[in-house]
């Protein structure tokens, strides 16, 4: 009788051991799968800022804090840098882009930046660059430099950043993206095909001269730590380009960094 009890106990222990080991392996596999999903990590990294879109009143950023790391000094509330530009190839070997960058200092609750117009040439010619200083008060862009061109003046004063009208909360539903990784930098990229029915695409077509019916590609790029960093680069691009050698896209970024003196080095 004692032998049978020991045998039953041994069998129970063996079954439980197999069950526990199986659960551990399943857990490890699930965890590994989760860790290996760089596409998901990239989307989650972007979601920290994109979930705030659309930011109709940019002054709300004065009361929002981003990711803080050791680069911030004690007491520094940080600075948001918001950027949007429209780039296009006018002809072979020439690229123009036009847009705005604005620095919102949470310490002083002031926002300054500039509107830029640039043309780049492939050979034998330096780029043309024009910067027009601006500031923002009461969620309104104020032009500080004198601009004779009335059309350009109006364009600057009425400028809206992509983040002010975009809605990318459905980003989590995008899947099967084309992912590329360079661990040495590190840098991470993922691309998704978009539909012309997408409201963000419709908004861009209504605001910019986009002479193509081609459905765009959403490109997400990160330089630096996926979990968050005040150092590195993070940008979103909606690319309408028809072919490899042409360029037609809208680039957007919203970054949080230690407050610093603005520099027109864009």
Swiss-Prot record:
Residues annotated as signal peptide: 1-22
Protein topology in the membrane: Lipid-anchor
InterPro entries in UniProt: Csa, Csa_sf
Keyword flag Magnesium: no
Gene Ontology CC, one term: plasma membrane
Residue positions bearing lipid (N-palmitoyl cysteine): 23
Localization (cell): Cell membrane
Covalently attached lipid (S-diacylglycerol cysteine), positions: 23
Primary location class: membrane
Family: Belongs to the staphylococcal tandem lipoprotein family.
Protein name as catalogued: Uncharacterized lipoprotein SAUSA300_0413
Taxonomic classification: Bacteria, Bacillati, Bacillota, Bacilli, Bacillales
């Amino acid at each position: 009788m004692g032998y049978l009890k020991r045998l039953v106990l041994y069998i129970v222990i063996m079954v439980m051991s197999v069950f526990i080991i199986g659960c551990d392996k399943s857990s490890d596999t699930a965890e590994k799968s989760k860790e290996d999903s760089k596409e998901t990590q990239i989307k989650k990294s972007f979601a920290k800022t994109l979930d705030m879109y659309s930011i109709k009143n940019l002054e709300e950023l004065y009361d929002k804090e981003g990711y803080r790391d050791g680069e911030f000094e004690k007491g520094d509330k940080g600075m948001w840098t918001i950027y949007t530009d429209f780039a296009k190839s006018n002809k072979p070997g020439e690229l123009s882009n036009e847009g705005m960058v604005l620095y919102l200092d949470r310490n002083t609750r002031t926002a300054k930046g500039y509107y830029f117009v640039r043309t780049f040439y492939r050979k034998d010619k330096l780029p043309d660059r024009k910067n027009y200083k601006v500031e923002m008060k009461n969620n309104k862009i104020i032009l500080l430099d004198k601009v004779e061109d009335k059309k350009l003046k109006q364009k600057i004063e009425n400028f809206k950043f992509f983040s002010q009208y975009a809605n990318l909360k459905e980003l989590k539903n995008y899947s099967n993206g084309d992912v590329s990784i360079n661990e040495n930098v590190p840098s991470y990229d993922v691309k998704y095909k978009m539909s012309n029915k997408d409201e963000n695409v419709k908004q861009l077509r209504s605001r910019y001269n986009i002479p193509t019916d081609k459905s765009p590609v959403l490109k997400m790029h990160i330089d630096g730590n996926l979990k968050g960093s005040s150092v590195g680069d993070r940008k979103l691009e909606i690319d309408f380009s028809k072919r490899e050698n042409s360029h037609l896209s809208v680039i957007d970024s919203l970054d949080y960094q230690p407050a610093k003196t603005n520099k027109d080095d864009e």
